[in-house]
């Protein structure tokens, strides 16, 4: 309901007199107050929107979706589509609007966005409206409209298309203001124009034509749907010529993954990236949409949601970076140089709030003046965040170089700013030149707004201030400063408004028709109008009022030239006009005491005048690759300078080089006779870049002796891609509890926490910079900065003696779960899980009598932020039946979806639970879930001949399917079983491979190759019948290239490393008598090692032999493949360890556990090998490690000097081999240094693998350069292929025949396909079974359709079936839609997300051990294991043994040798082994029963 009224503040007698005087022609037409009109609403309105330079205003009624429009500043209102006489297509507008958006660069245009794909546009400030349609709702996550900075007809519409299960962000574009609309592409975080602002258009004239239609979009990764793989791509043809677009070269000419946001600011585009494994952001900036640079903030770290890009200038970017804990909310203000690359610190301890708002504002229209609030007692706040903060105000008149206090005469003034703003629009200033206002107080610091606040005003841009009105007021400036209006704002009703016509020196009063509590006061954005709008409310009854207040009648006189002054915008310390960016700035401004209004040019924004100055030092900035010195007086090189060719023959020579300075682009200072800091200077050659020699002499080695009995566990705290820094940090615990740290990859070590005995290291699963150091007591230690410093907290219980102690949250970095023994008087104390949301500062109990609790948060698992799973004993009794208990509110409420469980494990998107089978005694069964809410029984194939399921091992799920090993024989030293593979939700399994080898510990000879889709190696027992009779196992190695659908023998090389043919001679083709066999996971001394590395795609090593079966490891040779396992060659006789460096640029081999002083390395993909002597004395090498990503040029040998007890680490540094970074043309993918490598299937043509051709960059073996890239990068998915037989596998209850076809298992009936309809009531149709199902990983299109031949309508959906043809998209046990990219990328998620959760649970009465890996960079990790005392920490994907009883987990991780438990090693060793498995084991067997391990365990117990 709307009620309108109009009233004047003049008396009736005076009004009659004025009318009479007017009727006789007198010029006296002056009123004593403003005209006031109002309307009443029943609900709160949205913020009003003004058309700039007009009195036309709109607002949206939030409850009804009605749009109100006024052409007279709010006096008269009409509802568009109902009672509006405006021309145009507005009929559908009556109740259909969700938002109003102005065009930011064209004051004639605005847009009303509707709910149902129908929207409206005006091009004449609301006089007419035109309807247009876009088949998508406005995006809820991205700005719905993105505008072009030069052509106002170009607009990007960002919407979302939703089905019953998911929404897809998509972008459309128009080039004619929605006369026509075209789809552009699906996105992850939306699209924007390269020319996104007028300032960008003005500054890029050189490339104007090239980027005129350029669009930038943040899209999903090619193989990974998660935010860590988001890419920034661009297109100059709206993605019509190239659907995927071209990746922007953000960092040194190369693309960057993990783009989370991109935005335009003045003449810059800023993009932020965050890599997996860090909370640090990298910011990239461009000023031409072509060349990008990483922004440098010195030693300051930028974190997600911990920085704010502020209002900048046309020559710099302002960024406030939070440099404290979020509870204290203080920051550092930085200003960039002119290209946005190097940022300098302006002022520290800026005041921020929890939402990231910063107390910062540039004074509108005046260059160089900035108002900020800082925390004066910052030290007290850092020590006690709950202490009262003392905020003070500061102002700068020189672009932030210096700051000073605000002054009211001789008193300091402090003003409430952005974080406490009580109005809309700017806080202090407006386009009215020099008029600045604020609410605050004088004194030592800022006090309460309501109790102590007064209104202050300055009319000289903040140089001097005076009290305007007592008590806090909302305020607005109109008519370019000629009128100021205010209303008291102390949370009490008022009807009095006040106004001033002389810059706030004197005030007049007018009254409203009722008392209201003011909500906001506003006027036109350019502050040119004489009309104001006030919105307020009354509490009883709850009504809202909108007041239009018109001051046009206060004066009749139009201002003349004599009423204006030429006002200097900035003054120096002498009171003279000051220079900035090479000029002085002036405004033609109405004098404060002029008795007039500016009516003739009312709606024209004031424009400044400029006068040039001579160049001074302040007009220069640091040039590219230079940064300010500490005293900010010089520009010093940020990198080593390269001397020109032909110079620097001796170190004593000099060469002409850059001074380090350049004139700030856009600076207009006069250079004649002025300072010239940018002239070239002489630079010493000794500081220039030296050229490496390029041979083995350039490799260096550094040895360090560690005084300890034995190495323990160690972890690389590797920097992620967006993390700035060059250190290569390792933390290492010795078996006697000492902690050692190196920041230079083992070249030097320091002993930390010297008075503390560390029992375990528990690296943070999701953040590489963090690690926790657990002791036997309750005081625990941790680092959050890569072991630069250490802090402590008090744990709520001691370390868990038999399982995981610490659990981490994927999103909230300070959330932790601690599980440990509770307090009891006798017997075995039940374990208790606690939660802390503040990194251990405080703890609350989650559940008692648990085995473990884990966070289940996952980026693609809806509403899982607070989801927790616990394995709890019924009745909170130690001997109570175990049950799965879940909660989304920290167990204020909970559910119990499964009882009688053995354990649960998480693998990528899958949650696998082993429970006792109620229908079969002493047998287990598997349940699965994807969303953590709905669970379903797993259906095993009937041809799986395992009558009693006593043991499972959950293997890899990196290809959107679970691989599960079901044990057929679990007798000591005879164990083997079948590998079955699930569908996309983990519930329906088909047989993949029989008789796969399993060891006594429940681990399996099965490994997916890092980075290669669908390629896996396995060892099978070829003599199972003899094994059943007690014979030793004979193992045969097999390989699959299509994700386990088909397995083949591994082809042997034709000749050995000496050029001799193998005795079994097969001409390179595998036969039963002659194939390559490789020692697998169950035989590794370091369980975290892998055949390959995710960063060196397709490069593989293995130790084994050629023959009929796998021979002794002592007689093995070392083999290498460069094509993903399709072909192999022997590279060395003997058993060697291997590692990959610089993404495969350097391959290193060292003989395992034999005295040696030499390593071998190759820089040409294994074609040739060079020997390097790393020690004068022979060393027995126990492990070889490098950073988990395999991108370092440093390696570390762990060993013991032969003939002595000295333990030694030896760093190998290969960085001197090459002197340049390889050149890459990302647009074509090839260059003089790179070629494109395509994985392929050995039996398929055209390099199609899983329905597409994938291309990777590979450095040419002949190129003498470094990759210097932090992650393996897919160049592109060049195209999808048509479907062939290789894109299908046998369906449930079908098996592969000798001719390759799939047939029903004999004796079984076809599955009842209509069950699908019963399980999915919303499904429209089902398909008759064909015996085939698509491999979840494939993206093929068209071609052979083997899985869907005949469809049928589901009962009661016949009519819908007729209307819709195609699959329903539901899955077996609950509805879920998973994009193809998820299917392709699940392994990458495993690699990046699940670093450190890899546990094992065993049966029987023996001790148990947990296996752990450190973090690595391997997308398709399988089977990592290593032993760690008392807890499972830092692994990528848990192998988990689920069995009938829970057993304790004990032991230590250390370098193999001398009867000690297993170590932690490198990327491939270390964390590389990321995603492996979990097992469920039998009742009687000792797991990890291998003699070596049992002895090691015994040693540790003793």
UniProtKB/Swiss-Prot annotation:
BNR repeat feature ranges: 68-78, 120-130, 395-404, 456-466, 498-508, 740-750, 1119-1129, 1160-1171
Parts of the chain on the Cytoplasmic side: 1391-1422
InterPro entries: Sortilin_C (IPR031777), Sortilin_N (IPR031778), VPS10 (IPR006581), VPS10-sortilin (IPR050310), WD40/YVTN_repeat-like_dom_sf (IPR015943)
Keywords: Glycoprotein, Golgi apparatus, Membrane, Protein transport, Receptor, Repeat, Signal, Transmembrane, Transmembrane helix, Transport
Entry membrane topology: Multi-pass membrane protein
Signal sequence, renumbered to the chain: 1-29
Taxonomic lineage: Eukaryota, Fungi, Dikarya, Ascomycota, Pezizomycotina
Protein name per UniProt: Vacuolar protein sorting/targeting protein 10
Glycosylation sites: 314, 339, 985, 1280
Chief localisation class: Golgi
Pfam family, any one: Sortilin-Vps10
GO BP terms in the entry: Golgi to endosome transport; Golgi to vacuole transport; protein targeting to vacuole
Similarity comment text for this entry: Belongs to the VPS10-related sortilin family.
Role, per record: Functions as a sorting receptor in the Golgi compartment required for the intracellular sorting and delivery of soluble vacuolar proteins, like carboxypeptidase Y (CPY) and proteinase A. Executes multiple rounds of sorting by cycling between the late Golgi and a prevacuolar endosome-like compartment.
TM stretches of this protein: 1370-1390, 1423-1443
Compartments in which it is found: Golgi apparatus, trans-Golgi network membrane; Prevacuolar compartment membrane
Topology, Lumenal side: 30-1369, 1444-1502
Cellular component GO terms, alphabetical: cytosol; Golgi apparatus; membrane
């Amino acid at each position: 309901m709307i009620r309108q009224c109009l009233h004047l503040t003049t008396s009736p007698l005076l009004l009659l007199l004025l009318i009479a005087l007017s009727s006789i022609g007198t010029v006296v037409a002056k009123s004593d107050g403003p005209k006031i009109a109002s309307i009443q609403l029943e609900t709160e309105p949205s913020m009003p929107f003004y058309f700039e330079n007009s009195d036309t205003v709109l607002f949206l009624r939030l409850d009804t979706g009605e749009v109100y429009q006024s052409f007279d500043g709010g006096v008269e209102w009409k509802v568009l589509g109902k009672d509006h006489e405006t021309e145009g297509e507005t009929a559908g507008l009556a109740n259909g609007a969700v938002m109003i958006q102005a065009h930011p660069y064209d004051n004639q245009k605005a847009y009303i966005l509707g709910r149902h794909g129908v929207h409206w546009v005006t091009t004449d400030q609301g006089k007419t409206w035109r309807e247009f349609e876009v088949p998508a709702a406005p995006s809820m996550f991205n700005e719905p409209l993105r505008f072009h900075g030069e052509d106002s007809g170009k607009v990007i519409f960002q919407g979302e298309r939703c089905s019953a299960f998911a929404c897809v962000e998509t972008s459309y574009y128009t080039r004619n203001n929605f006369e026509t609309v075209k789809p552009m592409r699906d996105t992850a975080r939306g699209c924007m124009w390269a020319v996104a602002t007028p300032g960008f258009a003005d500054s890029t004239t050189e490339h104007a034509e090239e980027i005129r239609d350029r669009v930038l979009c943040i899209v999903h990764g090619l193989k990974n749907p998660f935010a860590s793989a988001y890419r920034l791509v661009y297109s100059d043809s709206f993605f019509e010529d190239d659907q995927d677009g071209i990746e922007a070269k953000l960092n040194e000419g190369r693309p960057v993954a993990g783009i989370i946001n991109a935005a335009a600011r003045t003449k810059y585009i800023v993009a932020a990236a965050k890599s997996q494994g860090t909370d640090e952001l990298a910011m990239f900036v461009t000023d031409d949409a072509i060349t990008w640079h990483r922004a440098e903030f010195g030693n300051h770290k930028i974190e997600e949601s911990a920085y704010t890009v502020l209002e900048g200038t046309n020559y710099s970017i302002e960024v406030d970076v939070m440099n404290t804990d979020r509870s204290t909310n203080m920051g550092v203000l930085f200003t960039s140089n002119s290209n946005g690359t190097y940022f300098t610190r302006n002022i520290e301890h800026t005041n921020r709030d929890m939402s990231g708002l910063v107390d910062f504002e540039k004074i509108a229209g005046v260059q160089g003046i900035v108002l900020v609030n800082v925390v004066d007692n910052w030290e007290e706040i850092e020590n006690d965040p709950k202490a009262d903060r003392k905020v003070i105000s500061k102002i700068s008149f020189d672009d932030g170089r210096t700051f000073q206090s605000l002054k009211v005469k001789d008193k300091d003034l402090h003003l409430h700013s952005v974080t406490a703003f009580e109005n809309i629009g700017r806080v202090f200033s407006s386009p009215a030149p020099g008029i600045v206002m604020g609410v605050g107080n004088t004194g030592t610091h800022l006090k309460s707004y309501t109790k102590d606040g007064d209104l202050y005003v300055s009319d000289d841009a903040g140089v001097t201030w005076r009290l305007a009105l007592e008590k806090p007021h909302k305020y607005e400036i109109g008519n370019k400063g000629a009128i100021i209006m205010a209303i008291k704002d102390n949370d009490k009703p008022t009807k009095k408004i006040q106004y001033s016509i002389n810059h706030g020196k004197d005030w007049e009063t007018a009254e409203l028709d009722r008392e209201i509590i003011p909500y906001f006061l506003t006027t036109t954005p350019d502050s040119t109008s004489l009309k104001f709008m006030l919105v307020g409310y009354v509490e009883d009854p709850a009504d809202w009022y909108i007041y239009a207040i018109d001051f046009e009648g206060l004066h009749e006189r139009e201002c003349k030239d004599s009423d204006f002054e030429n006002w200097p915008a900035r003054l120096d310390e002498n009171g003279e006009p000051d220079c900035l960016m090479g000029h002085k700035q002036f405004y033609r401004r109405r004098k404060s005491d002029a008795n007039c209004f500016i009516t003739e040019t009312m709606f024209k924004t004031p424009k400044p005048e400029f006068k040039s100055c001579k160049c001074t030092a302040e007009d220069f900035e640091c040039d590219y690759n230079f940064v300010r010195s500490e005293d900010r007086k010089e520009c010093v090189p940020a990198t080593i300078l390269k001397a020109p060719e032909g110079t620097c023959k001796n170190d004593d020579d000099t060469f002409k080089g850059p001074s380090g300075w350049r004139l700030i682009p856009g600076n207009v200072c006069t250079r004649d006779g002025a300072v010239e800091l940018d002239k070239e200077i002489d630079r010493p050659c000794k500081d220039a870049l030296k050229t490496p020699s390029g041979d083995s002499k350039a490799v260096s080695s550094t040895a360090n002796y560690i005084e300890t009995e034995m190495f323990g566990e160690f972890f690389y705290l590797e920097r992620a891609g967006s993390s700035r820094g060059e250190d290569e940090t390792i933390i290492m615990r010795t078996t006697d509890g000492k902690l050692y740290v190196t920041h230079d990859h083992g070249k030097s070590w320091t002993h930390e926490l010297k008075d503390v005995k560390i029992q375990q290291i528990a690296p943070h699963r999701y953040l590489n910079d963090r690690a926790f150091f657990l002791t036997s007591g309750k005081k625990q230690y941790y680092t959050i900065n890569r072991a630069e410093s250490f802090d402590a907290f008090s744990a709520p219980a001691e370390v868990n003696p038999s399982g995981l102690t610490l659990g981490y949250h994927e999103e909230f970095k300070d959330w932790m779960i601690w599980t440990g023994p509770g307090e009891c008087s006798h017997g075995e104390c039940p374990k208790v899980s606690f939660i802390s949301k503040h990194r251990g500062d405080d703890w609350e109990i989650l559940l008692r009598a648990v085995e473990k609790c884990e966070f289940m948060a996952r980026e693609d698992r809806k509403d899982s932020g607070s989801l927790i799973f616990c394995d709890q004993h019924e009745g909170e009794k130690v001997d109570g039946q175990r049950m799965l208990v879940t909660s989304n509110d920290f167990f204020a409420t909970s559910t119990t979806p499964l009882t009688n469980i053995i354990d649960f494990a998480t693998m990528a998107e899958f949650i696998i639970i082993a429970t006792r089978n109620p229908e079969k005694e002493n047998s287990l069964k598997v349940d699965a879930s994807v969303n953590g809410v709905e669970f379903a029984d797993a259906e095993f194939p009937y041809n799986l001949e395992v009558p009693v399921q006593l043991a499972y091992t959950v293997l890899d799920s990196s290809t959107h399917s679970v691989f599960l090993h079901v044990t057929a024989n679990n007798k000591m030293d005879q164990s083997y079983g079948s590998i079955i593979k699930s569908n996309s939700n983990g519930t329906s399994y088909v047989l993949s491979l029989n008789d796969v080898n399993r060891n006594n510990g429940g681990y399996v000879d099965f490994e997916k190759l890092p980075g290669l889709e669908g390629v896996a190696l396995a060892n099978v027992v070829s003599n199972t019948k003899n094994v059943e009779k007690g014979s030793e196992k004979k193992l045969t190695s097999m390989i699959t290239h299509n994700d386990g659908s088909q397995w083949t023998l591994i082809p042997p090389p034709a000749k050995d490393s000496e050029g001799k043919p193998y005795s079994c001679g097969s001409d390179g083709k595998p036969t039963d008598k002659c194939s390559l066999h490789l020692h697998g996971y169950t035989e590794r001394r370091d369980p975290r090692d892998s055949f390959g590395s995710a960063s060196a795609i397709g490069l593989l090593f293995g130790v084994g032999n050629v023959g009929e079966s796998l021979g002794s490891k002592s007689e093995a040779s070392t083999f290498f493949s460069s094509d993903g396992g399709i072909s192999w060659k022997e590279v060395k006789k003997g058993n060697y360890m291997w590692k990959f460096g610089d993404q495969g640029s350097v391959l290193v081999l060292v003989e395992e556990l034999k005295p040696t002083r030499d390593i071998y390395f190759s820089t040409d993909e294994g074609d040739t090998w060079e020997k390097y002597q790393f020690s004068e004395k022979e060393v027995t090498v126990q492990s070889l490690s490098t950073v988990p990503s395999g991108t370092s040029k440093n390696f570390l040998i762990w060993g013991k000097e032969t003939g002595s007890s000295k333990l030694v680490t030896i760093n190998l540094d290969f960085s001197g081999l090459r002197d340049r970074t390889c050149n890459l043309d990302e647009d074509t993918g090839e260059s003089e240094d790179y070629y494109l490598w395509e994985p392929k299937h050995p039996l398929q043509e055209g390099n199609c693998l899983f329905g597409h051709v994938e291309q990777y960059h590979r450095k040419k073996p002949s190129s003498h350069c470094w990759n210097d890239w932090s992650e393996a990068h897919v160049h592109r998915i060049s195209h999808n292929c048509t479907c062939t037989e290789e894109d299908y596998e046998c369906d449930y209850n079908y098996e592969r025949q000798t001719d390759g076809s799939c047939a029903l298992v004999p004796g079984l009936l076809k599955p009842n396909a209509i069950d699908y309809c019963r399980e999915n009531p919303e499904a429209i149709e089902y398909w008759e079974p064909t015996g085939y199902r698509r491999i979840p990983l494939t993206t093929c299109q068209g071609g052979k359709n083997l899985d869907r031949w005949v469809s049928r309508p589901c009962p009661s959906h016949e009519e819908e079936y007729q209307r819709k043809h195609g699959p329903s998209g539901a899955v077996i046990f609950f509805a879920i839609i998973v994009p193809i990219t998820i299917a392709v990328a699940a392994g990458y998620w495993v690699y990046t997300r699940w670093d450190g959760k890899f546990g094992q649970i065993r049966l029987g009465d023996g001790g148990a051990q947990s296996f752990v890996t450190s973090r690595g960079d391997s997308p398709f990790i399988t089977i990592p294991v290593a032993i760690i005392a008392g807890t499972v920490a830092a692994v990528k994907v848990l192998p988990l043994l689920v069995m009938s009883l829970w057993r304790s987990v004990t032991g230590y991780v250390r370098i193999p040798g001398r009867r000690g438990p297993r170590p932690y090693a490198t990327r491939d060793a270390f964390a590389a082994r990321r995603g492996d498995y979990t097992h469920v084991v039998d009742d009687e067997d000792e797991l990890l029963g291998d003699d070596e391990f049992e002895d090691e365990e015994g040693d540790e117990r003793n």
